[in-house]
UniProtKB/Swiss-Prot annotation:
Pfam families: RasGEF, RasGEF_N. This is Ras guanine nucleotide exchange factor S. GO terms for biological process: Ras protein signal transduction. It comes from the Eukaryota. Signal peptide: none annotated.
Length: 1043
């Protein structure tokens, strides 16, 4: 069968299976579009460098081609018979070939679709017109088509048969021009959908014979799909339509658009939005079929200097020469668009809006700025500045020797992936925020769609970056690629089950099994909000780090390409892990909110006539002894207990503690502080408030003396005031409603408490206002970071670019921002040591996680450097960071640094440590002395007792002390008094005094903050670290210094 090659390009071919890309063959190939000389059929054939046919597919009529990046095209083909859909990806080695292949393949699709339409119209006409049926019978008497003489072919035509495949490397322009000269206006597709009618310029009929022949390069692009090619219109000497197939504009609409998909209105805006910074002119027929030429002609220069406005609007063919048809609404709209286009100034601001994101492109002269604005008003953390000169500088050619390093030439493709990854990560965070504001337990569609987009971006990224087979961490790349190939698993992202072991702070199964009552659900909801905010920060920072890493690599500033790819794999794995925890927390949060709403609806219907009784029943636990009224117990014990002066154990019930707290004869401020700080180890906030209300209403049998009753009631109000001021986080909405109910009754009474009730209401209103502000701040994005192109740093180069003092300062600021949120209730009942109760100690978990993560990051940065000289410098710089951390009294990060340097994988690097400077060795010796475990870390405790504030202690030692207190003292003591046998076990309040003292020793460090100022982007980068596990670090260590 005679075939002619329309175009040949150099690329790597991919195929999408189950939504994920996989290379058809890992080597570069020669991909050609072949056209049959007998009929208008086309097929794609790819021959590898060792002459293997790795791809041979017919081009189907139902085909689409989409730009995913400036060097990656996606081809979608649908079978007309079986409706099977196939996706093929073309990863180009040379940027100039992209637009040419796009135009050629689009023409093939248009030709096939035109043939189908003509065939359909002919069949319909034959069924109606008898004369045409007779003509058809006459035509059927003609000889078969295979007996007709074949058309003339050019000497340069390549012949492909089943036995032998031979593809030409160059095609004769003359022969192709002769073949294209037979195409008439009827071969053109109808106008685009937005130009549904003809626009007439004169009253003379159109003479089709006077039109010049149309070549391939002058045909319009395919219909608008997921990715729309922007076009510009020029008119000279008759009809001339030149389509400029523009690459993606950095920060603008992308081939892998943000999720959810844009609405109809948004798509219309997308079609008119900015599309490219590429100034190259439209490909002509000579450019389309001749070999690649990197020299810019004068014509290209002229096109690049044309008005920028034309690059921002999809072309609409000027059809006024076609006849005399009346103007329609669509035609008037087209004219208005053309007038608006003429009125555009040199400065252009175009906006592309989707459901949740808005990309704003600002063009000034030859440069353009872009930023992302989300539904929540957030702007992207990065601003990119680009110029038209960058596109010319990025046009590189590769020899066969450099073929396997094709990723380094995908400059714009990598930059677009970087932009898309950051945008979609921010979009995912927007969707999570929406779920927090309006939780829906079963609506995960948009979250799943956004997650799939992120996986697609990452998968295309590793297709572009290739492999790192010689780097010791190359196994990690294979692991990450396989994880991306499997795609996001619902059991990992949307079930709420435990992931990543110790880093999991919530568990949906635990919520289902052990949470009883609305109070516990409300407490869990509050903790989950904090966890979701923290995990959102992790996802944002990791997404930014990966994005900047890709962007930095695309500029080819380092010869250690494989090291960067391993870094990307590490960032990718950490990003996937953070997203899984974030989405699991979000699903858990939605479930908790649904359970709270269900319980409240039940209680509302059941307590219509007994509201106050229902509230008291709701906050009680029927399995505890606190159901005994405080006054009934006073009848039994006769007298109120007092705090022992000799330091002996105080053994009392909850009712007795409240009686002591509000005694009309004595007041002990230390006892009040100890009680309010530790009461949650034996009672909930709702139960305590109930006891205070019981105490407030004094029965007549106890006393009728107004002064005595007033003293008791004022003591209750003083306790309530101190509680609200110092432990505001204890109050959930259920308890707040009860307090407001009490305040209203107090204000309406005639007992002279109107001023006190006003004071309590003011405190409660302020507490709620502060809580709302804190909630908004949790999900408020920080100010964006502005990067110039030359100043964008790779996270892997972060440690070497910034000074040791700056790194220590930013670590200290981050640590203190976490430490200051620590609350006493997180230390109670050893919740931080119990897997199913860790969610009750979120700040402790964050502190532990931060210190552990920093330790592994220290080892990671050292072991990622394969050169010993550079590895020694990194080791010494970490020692210098430790020196500044010690000066700043940041023992949390200092302990993490010391632990990282003493991990087995680092400690065994004898050749590296042998070359350390004397100053580095002295710092290591000092750290070893301070954190020596002798005599229960006596050196550290002595040093901590002498430091001046501000200071951040290492939390692990405090938790150890609290664990000793918890395990060395019982919670309750059995009563030996037979008369008190019916009141149950007694609370060991001596244990609570010890816990309060431990908390007081720790909380004093929260009072004095640091005065350092955040430095960006260092502060943002240090919020989260990419790390490897123990085995991976040890494998790197063995590779660097074998046994």
């Amino acid at each position: 069968m005679g075939e002619v090659s329309l175009i040949g390009i150099t690329a790597i071919l991919c195929q999408k299976t189950d939504g994920f890309w996989k290379n058809i063959d890992d080597s570069l190939c020669r991909l050609e579009v072949l056209k049959s000389n007998i009929d208008s059929k086309f097929r794609l054939v790819a021959i590898s460098t060792d002459n293997r046919c790795i791809f041979n597919k017919w081009v189907r009529t139902n085909s689409e081609i989409t730009k995913c990046s400036d060097l990656f095209l996606e081809i979608k083909q649908v079978s007309s018979q079986s409706s099977n859909v196939e996706y093929f990806g073309v990863n180009f080695a040379y940027k100039p070939e992209v637009d040419k292949f796009y135009a050629c393949f689009s023409k093939c699709i248009e030709t096939l679709q035109t043939q189908r339409r003509q065939s359909t119209l002919n069949i319909q006409a034959l069924q109606i017109n008898n004369e045409l049926q007779q003509q058809l019978q006459q035509q059927q008497q003609l000889p078969p088509i295979d007996q007709l003489p074949p058309p003339p072919t050019s000497t340069s035509t390549s012949t492909i048969s089943n036995a032998n495949i031979s593809i030409s490397n160059s095609i004769s322009y003359d022969s192709l021009h002769q073949m294209a000269s037979g195409i008439t206006l009827e071969d053109l597709p109808p106008p685009p959908p937005s130009a549904s009618s003809l626009i007439l310029n004169n009253n003379t009929p159109l003479d089709l014979t006077s039109l010049p022949p149309i070549d391939f390069s002058n045909l319009p692009p395919p219909p608008t799909g997921l990715m729309t090619s922007r076009s510009s219109l020029t008119e000279a000497n008759g009809l001339e339509i030149k389509n400029k197939l523009s690459p993606l504009l950095n920060g603008g609409a992308s081939g892998l658009s943000s999720s959810p998909p844009p609405t109809t209105e948004s798509k219309n805006q997308l079609n008119s939005s900015s599309g490219s910074n590429n100034s190259s002119s439209a490909p002509h027929l000579t450019d389309l079929f001749l070999p690649t030429n990197n020299n810019n002609s004068s014509g290209n220069q002229s096109a690049s200097n044309s008005s920028p406005t034309s690059q921002y609007h999809q072309s609409q063919p000027n059809l006024q020469q076609y006849g005399t048809a009346p103007l329609t609404a669509s035609s008037k709209l087209l004219q208005q668009q053309q007038q608006q286009q003429q009125q555009q100034q040199q400065n252009i601001i175009m906006t592309t809006t989707t459901t949740t994101t808005t990309t704003i492109n600002i063009k000034t002269g030859s440069s353009s700025d872009s930023f992302l604005k989300t539904a929540s008003g957030r702007r992207s953390i990065r601003v990119r500045h680009s110029t038209n000169q960058a596109a010319d500088q990025q046009k590189k050619t590769m020899g066969r020797k450099d073929g396997l390093a094709v990723s380094l030439q995908n400059v714009e493709g990598l930059q677009n992936i970087a932009e898309n990854l950051e945008d979609e990560t921010l979009n995912l965070l927007d969707l999570v925020n929406e779920q927090v504001v309006t939780p829906e337990i079963s609506n995960n569609a948009h979250l799943n769609q956004s997650l799939m987009k992120i996986f697609e971006h990452l998968q295309v990224l590793f297709i572009l970056t290739g492999q790192a087979s010689t780097h010791p961490g190359g196994k990690l790349i294979t692991q990450v690629v396989n994880k991306l190939g499997r795609g996001p698993q619902a059991s990992e992202f949307f079930s709420g089950k435990s992931v990543d072991g110790g880093y999991q702070w919530y568990n949906l199964d635990e919520v289902k099994d052990s949470v009883i009552g609305i109070h516990n659900l409300l407490a869990l909801k509050k903790n989950l909000i904090t966890a979701i905010a923290h995990l959102s920060t992790c996802v944002r920072v990791l997404g930014l780090q990966a994005s900047l890493e890709i962007d930095w690599m695309s500029r080819n500033k380092s010869s250690e390409t494989e090291k960067i790819v391993v870094q990307l794999a590490c960032l990718t794995r950490e990003l996937i892990s953070s997203m899984s925890r974030l989405l699991a927390a979000t699903v858990t949060y939605c479930y908790v909110c649904s359970s709270i709403a269900f319980i409240r609806n039940q209680q509302h219907s059941a307590s219509a006539d007994h509201n106050q009784a229902s509230i008291q029943n709701r906050i009680r636990s029927p399995s505890t002894i606190d159901t005994i009224n405080i006054w009934d117990e006073l009848k039994t014990i006769k007298t109120i207990p007092t705090v022992p002066k000799d330091g002996s154990i105080l053994k009392v019930t909850l009712n007795q503690l409240v009686l002591m707290l509000t005694s009309e004869t004595s007041y002990d401020s230390k006892f009040l502080k100890t009680f309010i700080t530790t009461y949650q180890s034996f009672a909930s906030p709702g139960v305590l408030f109930t006891k205070l209300i019981e105490r407030f209403y004094v029965p007549e049998w106890y006393s009728t003396v107004p002064t005595k009753i007033s003293t008791i009631q004022q003591k209750v109000i003083v306790v309530l005031k101190y509680w609200i001021e110092n432990q505001s986080s204890d109050f959930d909405q259920d308890v707040i409603d009860q307090i407001y109910f009490f305040i209203n009754n107090l204000a309406n009474s005639n007992e002279g408490y109107s001023e006190l009730s006003r004071l309590l209401r003011g405190l409660l209103d302020k507490m709620i206002q502060d809580r709302e502000v804190k909630f908004e701040l949790l999900f408020q994005m920080p100010p964006r970071i502005s990067f110039e192109e030359d100043s964008i740093l790779s996270p892997i180069e972060l440690f070497s670019e910034w000074s040791a003092q700056s790194i220590a300062q930013q670590l200290t600021l981050i640590d203190f921002s976490i430490f200051k949120d620590l609350e006493a209730r997180e230390l109670l009942n050893q919740n931080f040591n119990k897997p199913k109760l860790k969610y009750k100690s979120p700040t402790i978990m964050r502190m532990i996680s931060k210190s552990t993560q920093f330790s592994f990051w220290v080892a990671y940065v050292i072991l990622m450097e394969p050169k010993k000289e550079k590895r020694i410098k990194i080791f010494e710089k970490f020692c210098e960071v430790g020196k500044y951390l010690l000066k700043m009294n940041n023992f949390n990060s200092l302990m993490g640094l010391n632990a990282g340097l003493n991990l087995t994988c680092v400690h065994r690097l004898k050749k590296t440590k042998k070359k350390l400077s004397s100053s580095a060795i002295s710092i290591l010796t000092e750290l070893e002395r301070i954190f020596s475990s002798k005599k229960s870390f006596k050196n550290y405790r002595d040093h901590l007792s002498t430091v001046q504030l501000p200071c951040i202690p290492y939390l692990g030692f405090n938790l150890t002390d609290i664990t000793f207190i918890e395990e060395g003292n019982t919670d309750n003591i059995s009563s030996t008094d037979p008369a008190a046998a019916n009141i149950g076990p007694l609370i060991n309040f001596k244990k609570r005094e010890l816990l309060y003292q431990a908390w007081a020793d720790l909380s004093r460090f929260q009072e004095t903050p640091y005065t350092f100022q955040p430095e960006e982007p260092l502060n943002t980068f240090l919020l989260n670290f990419p790390i490897l596990d123990d085995k991976e670090l040890y494998d790197l260590s063995i590779a660097l210094e074998p046994k």
